[in-house]
From Swiss-Prot:
Involved in sucrose metabolism. Its EC number is 2.7.1.4. It comes from Klebsiella pneumoniae. The gene is scrK. PANTHER family: HEXOKINASE FAMILY MEMBER, PSEUDOURIDINE KINASE-RELATED. This is Fructokinase. The keyword Ribosomal protein does not apply.
Length: 307
């Protein structure tokens, strides 16, 4: 198949602690990370979104272009500023985020910013793109357009509750996006939030019954991944690594997964899914072994050596 993978949303400059009182400027943002992750694996990826026509925005556009991501639909907005996030890391490499620019340029995405979609292509989005207008309406228009064209939707909620003024808006937008998604990736916490159940088996059953995605993946960190494919459910253990920074692990996982799905299609059974999940899990594991979300994303050669 080898369909193009479009990724829509925010491109962010992450500011990471780097010694006493210093911050390291790193390219990031979950959608931008996924686009670069796919390109590093040899996939055809394109980024859809807005950044400010400012030093950070030009830095992000140049970075993605250098990574061989199609940036023809990555707009520079002179009226807005690029999203900037301070990332705090604890002793285990776990992170918290402080968003410094609100609203940022990515939330001003317009329908005219969208590419023409085609059959066999994928569109991956996160919920930050749904958190405010006009990005919300534009993102839903994109999701509906690629489905009409015969393409596929991948959704990673990547919930940041503090970016939403109305909690009910968050739930309504999540429900609408989940109903359009062919492939869904959630954390355990997100599964509990959306399903209303702290039991992972019950939560998966509830989401499958309500939204009927073809593929639902629940990442459990060191415990691995729970996968539900066409009604079949199985657990896939994780490979052990020493984590330095977990910032880009989920995005690397999604990039590996999408690269596999775009190349082979969504499999009919869990046994056929196993190679794509192994690729995704290896990408996620390797991304935790270095500091920075995008800088740690693995290349195809890294995977071949690891596998």
């Amino acid at each position: 198949m080898n369909g193009k993978i479009w990724v829509l949303g925010d491109a962010v400059v992450d500011l990471l602690p780097d010694g006493e009182g210093r911050l390291l400027q790193c390219p990031g943002g979950a959608p931008a990370n996924v686009a670069v992750g796919v390109a590093r694996l040899g996939g055809d990826s394109g980024f859809i979104g807005r950044v400010g026509d400012d030093p950070f925005g030009r830095f992000m556009r140049h970075t993605l272009a250098q990574e061989q991501v199609d940036v023809n639909y990555m707009r520079l907005d002179a009226a807005q500023r690029t999203s900037t996030v301070v990332v705090d890391l604890d002793s285990h490499g776990e992170r918290t985020f402080t968003f410094m620019v609100r609203p940022s340029a990515d939330l001003f995405l317009q329908p005219e910013d969208l590419p023409p979609f085609a059959a066999g292509q994928w569109l991956h989005v996160c919920s930050i793109a749904l958190s405010a207008e006009p990005s919300r309406s534009t993102t839903f228009a994109a999701l509906e357009a690629i489905k009409r064209a015969g393409g596929y939707v991948s959704f990673d909620p990547n919930i940041r509750s503090d970016l939403w003024q109305d909690p009910q808006d968050l739930r309504d937008c999540l429900d609408r996006a989940l109903a359009l998604a062919d492939a869904i990736k959630l954390s355990e916490e997100e599964l509990a939030f959306i399903s209303g159940s702290d039991d992972i088996v019950s939560g998966i059953a509830r989401l499958n019954a309500r939204f009927q995605p073809t593929l639902l993946l629940v990442t459990q960190g060191k415990a691995g991944v729970q996968a539900a494919l066409r009604g079949q459910v199985s657990h896939f253990p994780a490979r052990p690594v020493v984590a330095v920074d977990t910032t880009g692990a989920g995005d690397a996982f999604v990039a590996g997964l999408l690269a596999g799905l775009a190349a082979h299609g969504i499999p009919d059974n869990l046994a056929a899914l196993a190679p794509d999940l192994a690729l995704a899990q290896t990408c996620g594991a390797l991304a935790t072994t270095a500091k920075g979300a995008m800088t740690a994303l693995p290349y195809k050669d890294d995977l071949q050596r690891s596998l």
